[in-house]
């Protein structure tokens, strides 16, 4: 169960990072 939580947290972190980069790119563009 700990492993699943860690994997989910990692997935959310990656998605959040990509979303943030896309948002910044749109603001700059």
UniProtKB/Swiss-Prot annotation:
Transmembrane segment boundaries? 9-29
User: Which membrane topology describes this protein?
Assistant: Single-pass membrane protein
- Main localisation, per the record? membrane
For this record, an example GO cellular component is: plasma membrane
Which domain of life does the protein's organism represent? Bacteria
| Compartmental location | Cell inner membrane
Induction context: Induced in response to DNA damage.
Q: Which UniProt keywords apply?
A: Cell cycle, Cell division, Cell inner membrane, Cell membrane, Membrane, Stress response, Transmembrane, Transmembrane helix
Q: Name one GO biological process term.
A: negative regulation of cell division
User: What binding partners and quaternary form does the record give?
Assistant: Interacts strongly with FtsW and to a lesser extent with FtsN.
Q: What does this protein do?
A: Inhibits cell division by binding directly to FtsW to prevent the final constriction of the FtsZ ring.
The protein's name in its UniProt record: Cell division inhibitor SidA
**Species:** Caulobacter vibrioides (strain NA1000 / CB15N)
């Amino acid at each position: 169960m700990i492993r699943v939580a860690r994997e989910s947290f990692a997935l959310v972190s990656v998605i959040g990072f990509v979303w943030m980069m896309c948002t910044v790119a749109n603001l700059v563009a």
